[in-house]
Design a protein with these regions (language model features):
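Active-site-adjacent pocket-lining segments in enzyme domains
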Residues: 1-87
Length: 87
């Protein structure tokens, strides 16, 4: 889930006791999860990201989870995390 989509996960009960991230301010509407202000957060089979500016980091994480070579993609596209987090 990316941007404000974790609200839907919250409403479905998916975020209970799970770490997540989302668009700034959205976390105030979510009471069950454990908010972390990071570019991408993975907790088990749940992957969340902060918003449109983090879409590439989110995509690279999904590629890695599916067994792809995310690092080669990062290098090839000269990717640099917009928030300065290590990915």
């Amino acid at each position: 889930a990316i941007c404000a989509a974790p609200i839907a996960l919250h409403q479905a009960g998916v975020l209970k006791d799970k770490r997540f991230t989302c668009y700034d301010g959205v976390q105030e509407q979510i009471t069950d999860g454990i908010y972390q202000k990071e570019t991408v957060v993975v907790d088990g089979n749940l992957t969340t990201s902060r918003g449109p500016s983090t879409a590439l980091a989110f995509a690279y994480e999904l590629v890695a989870q599916l067994g792809g070579d995310a690092e080669s993609l990062r290098v090839g596209m000269l990717y640099r995390d917009v928030f300065g987090n290590q990915q």
